[in-house]
Amino acid sequence: MRCYQILFSPTGGTEKVAAAITQNWPEVQTIDLSSTSTDFASFFIESDSLALVAMPSFGDVAPQLAIDRFAQINGNRAKCVLVAVYGNRAYGSTLVQMADTANAAGFQVIAAISAIAEHSIIHEYAAGRPNAEDCKQLSASVSYTHLRAHET
């Protein structure tokens, strides 16, 4: 089983959350949806793989650019965990939007998480998040060992 971290993190908050979740996973290949030089349609995820897909929520939705790029990846029935990262306000329909895109791209959504990170514009909101306690909870929330034990 290969592990992927598919993320869009223009200000670094989403990347911190994703890193906390995958810190105890075996070697993780990162697909950076903010890259302007990547052909996302060239990615074919192996069916026995696990992907963490993390995006920020702006105005209750994921950035359309991130959704459009994620939609180009061939999920090939690989399992995925979705993460909507928000700045202590709300994440609205971000996870639904991400799940719809993941399903259309061929992924099997097995879990979804909302996580707080420091607000990207008004830094006083959720300042310093994710903090050490957040990271501990995030790491435990999607344990690679737990996911492997429940493969079907």
Model-found features: residue ranges?
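A short, Lys/Arg-enriched amphipathic alpha-helix followed by its capping loop at the start of a domain
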Residues: 20-27
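Conserved anion/nucleotide-ligand pocket segment
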Residues: 130-134
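Short N-terminal binding/cap micro-motifs at the start of the first secondary-structure element
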Residues: 12-18
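A short acidic, helix-capping loop that chelates divalent metal ions and anchors anionic groups
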Residues: 119-125
